[in-house]
Amino acid sequence: MSKDRSSNFELLRLLCIFGILMMHTFGGIDTSVSFFNTEIHVLVNSIFNMGVTCFILLSGYFGIRFDFKKLIRLDLMIIFFTIFGTIAVGNLGIKALIKSCIPVISRYYWFISCYFFLCFLTPFLNQIPEKLSKENFEKLLAVLLLLFSVIPTFGFFEIMQDGGKGLVHMVMIYLLGRYLALYHNRSHNTGRLFLGLFLSIGFIFLADSSLTFVRGKLYTTFCGDCSIFIIFGSVMVLLLFRELNFHSRFINRAAGNVLAVYVLDGTVQTFLLKWIDFKPYAGSWFLVFLAIGYALAIMIIACLSVSYTHLTLPTNREV
């Protein structure tokens, strides 16, 4: 089930973590003081919140082979960097130290916790497309998407009450990735894929932007993790990057630090925010460029920290 990943997918992973950092950066800035920057904030969420879904789609597309030893190694590396980050920022409270010692169980990072539990389920999840016919597999995905994406997107009710940041959503997207790998492995028209992506982002932006304007505060329902438009856009992104075919040792090596960047994000931001204050620039037209530089700085510092410790976090392709 495992396949060698060329640099097109590794580049996608780098862009995904960059997008997540951009959202985290804008999330800490009060953009309400500027209509322009509020719109930029909505646009950032509309585009980059596809990052998490793309990560899970990639896991499903290539399939996870459960390996308990590698999972333990992953856990130990995450514990090391979490404890390092907790101590480095001076958070020496008993509760914080205990949580940092058990980051997976304590849901210190929701994505990593859910990913761990997903790994334990994959020996069974991987049998679903093997046991079900294509028609029944499509029916299963349709029901899952209806219950846990379509209905929550349009605000009727949300069964899981987690905004898509939970195990049920991750299982659903993983299975969708398996479906794409098995039944959509042919070449697609890139023009149509771009159109689908553009329409998805456009609807999310217009809907959330309009509601933000009417309600007077940032509205994020249509760009949430469980949004059907985010899921559709993420599928378009995955299929677009699959059409690329190139190899870069630099990109492949850099992509190996993606998980470390995610884990160290909070720690690096805590240090940087001691010297960087975005508040004076919240109304400036160049705020987005400052945010881009800030996100890139976090990625570089996190990667250098990993290199300095001579430790590497195994990527999800290794589990």
What residue spans do the PLM features occupy?
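Alpha-helical membrane-inserting segments
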Residues: F84, A88, L121, L125, ...
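Transmembrane alpha-helical segments and their boundary/interface "anchor" motifs
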Residues: C16, V42-I56, G63-C119, R192, ...
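Solvent-exposed interhelical
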Residues: D67-K70, F120-L144, Y179-G196
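Aromatic-anchored segments of alpha-helical transmembrane domains
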Residues: F18-T25, F81-A88, V143-F156, F198-S210, ...
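Conserved small/polar residues in nucleotide/adenosyl-binding loops
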Residues: T309-T315
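Alpha-helical transmembrane segments and terminal signal-anchor/GPI-anchor hydrophobic tails
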Residues: F156, M160, L167-M170, S187-N252, ...
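N-terminal membrane topogenic signal
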Residues: S2-L15
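Specific transmembrane alpha-helix
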Residues: N49-R65, F111-N126, F154-S187, C226-F246, ...
